[in-house]
Regions:
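Conserved small/polar residues in nucleotide/adenosyl-binding loops
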Residues: 151-158
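Conserved beta-strand segments of the P-loop GTPase G domain that flank and frequently precede/overlap
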Residues: 38, 89-90, 140-144, 163
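Short glycine-rich anion-binding loops that position phosphate/pyrophosphate groups of nucleotides
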Residues: 41, 122-125, 144-147
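Short, well-ordered beta-strand core segments
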Residues: 86, 117, 138-139, 153, ...
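Nucleotide-state-sensitive switch-loop elements of NTP-binding domains
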Residues: 4, 10-19, 33, 53-129
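Hydrophobic alpha-helical segments, chiefly the membrane-spanning helices
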Residues: 164-168
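Walker A (P-loop) phosphate-binding motif
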Residues: 25-58, 63
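Conserved Switch II/interswitch segment of TRAFAC-class P-loop GTPases
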Residues: 135-150
């Protein structure tokens, strides 16, 4: 019977992506640009939410949008029609942006003049959630077709009560 030899390299398959994401965060921090990775299923309201947000906050903050899509430019055209500074990133069949694509897009976008940059990721909830893009925050919009997600964090008082022995 043959021997099995295991070689454990202890390196994440995301190691290169994570390194680029860290560089992206450092670059944006230096430029004083806060980047949000906005995710949802198709039709959940990402574009509409971004246009309304830009209209509400545009007088106080310089806002830009990075539109990610497999092949379409529809959302970037909507942003432009609404007067929102944006660029279109075609992911070439990839189901979500990764750190390398984000960095390439940033090289084409004048982020130094922005306070807030929102990446409208590809309409998909499977791929983008686990991929680090270099964004400061990840935000998910859930709509009724996905069902209702309710997360409540217990208050400190409730947590304290749960540590008390039961009287039964």
């Amino acid at each position: 019977m043959g021997n099995v030899r295991v070689i454990d390299v202890h390196q994440s398959v995301y190691a290169v992506n994570d390194e680029i994401a860290a560089k992206t965060r450092a670059r944006l921090k230096e430029e004083k640009t806060f980047m949000v990775n906005l995710m949802s299923s198709p039709g959940a309201g990402k574009t509409t939410t971004l246009i309304r947000t830009a209209n509400m906050l545009g007088d106080r903050y310089r806002i830009g949008v990075m539109e990610a899509d497999i092949d379409s430019s529809v959302d970037a055209e909507k942003m432009a029609a609404a007067g929102v500074t944006s660029i279109q990133v075609h992911t070439g069949g990839e189901c979500a942006m990764d750190a390398h694509m984000t960095m390439q897009a940033l090289d084409e976008f004048d982020t130094e003049g922005l306070d807030l940059l929102v990446m409208e990721n590809v309409g998909n909830l499977v791929c983008p959630a686990e991929t680090d893009t270099g964004a400061s925050r990840n935000v998910v919009i859930l709509s009724y077709p996905e069902g209702c997600l309710l997360y409540t964090s217990p208050s400190p008082r409730d947590r304290q009560k749960s540590r008390m022995p039961s009287s039964a």
